[in-house]
């Protein structure tokens, strides 16, 4: 599985997902140290439930080349409730009335996890954080920095250099001198 999707079930983790894509891409997309093979794992950062409709179909029924990591938040520190409103012809949705919005988000996440587990051959894991705090996000960042280093060792790349990025910088410097 050469594609890893992080499916974070909170818009507050949007920038974490962007950081993960940058970290994973620049650290793992390289030549192997002891061979001429190009290797790397393609990172994709998704926000649930927004990206369920655009990307879940690809994960469920597309090429089996993706693993998925879900990130859930137990306490959103937000008491927003779904209003107690009955809409004509949509009475079946009344079960959502007075439900905390955060509970709906986590139930959606749980349902997607269950659907993927039913597929039986899509690797997935789940990270649950208590709440979005500096300490918890710092721990998540530290975990991914360590994980990236370990994966680099497994696929035999130096996670701490950027030869592909450097090549573009060298060409840019040369072009700027020509101005």
Model-assigned labels for residue ranges:
Residues 1-179:
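A SIS-like phosphosugar-recognition module
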């Amino acid at each position: 599985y050469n594609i890893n999707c992080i499916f974070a079930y909170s818009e507050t983790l949007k920038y974490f997902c962007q950081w993960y894509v940058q970290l994973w891409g620049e650290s793992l997309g390289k030549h192997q140290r002891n061979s001429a093979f190009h290797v790397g794992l393609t990172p994709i950062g998704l926000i649930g439930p927004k990206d369920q409709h655009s990307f879940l179909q690809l994960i469920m029924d597309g090429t089996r080349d993706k693993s998925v990591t879900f990130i859930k938040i137990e306490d959103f520190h937000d008491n927003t409730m779904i209003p107690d409103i009955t809409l004509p012809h949509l009475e079946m949705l009344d079960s959502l009335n007075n439900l905390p919005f955060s509970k709906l988000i986590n139930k959606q996440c749980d349902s997607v996890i269950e659907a993927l587990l039913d597929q039986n051959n899509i690797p997935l894991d789940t990270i649950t954080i208590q709440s979005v705090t500096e300490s918890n996000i710092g721990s998540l960042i530290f975990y991914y920095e360590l994980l990236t280093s370990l994966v680099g060792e497994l696929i035999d790349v130096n996670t701490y250099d950027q030869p592909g990025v450097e090549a573009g910088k060298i060409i840019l410097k040369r072009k700027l001198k020509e101005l």
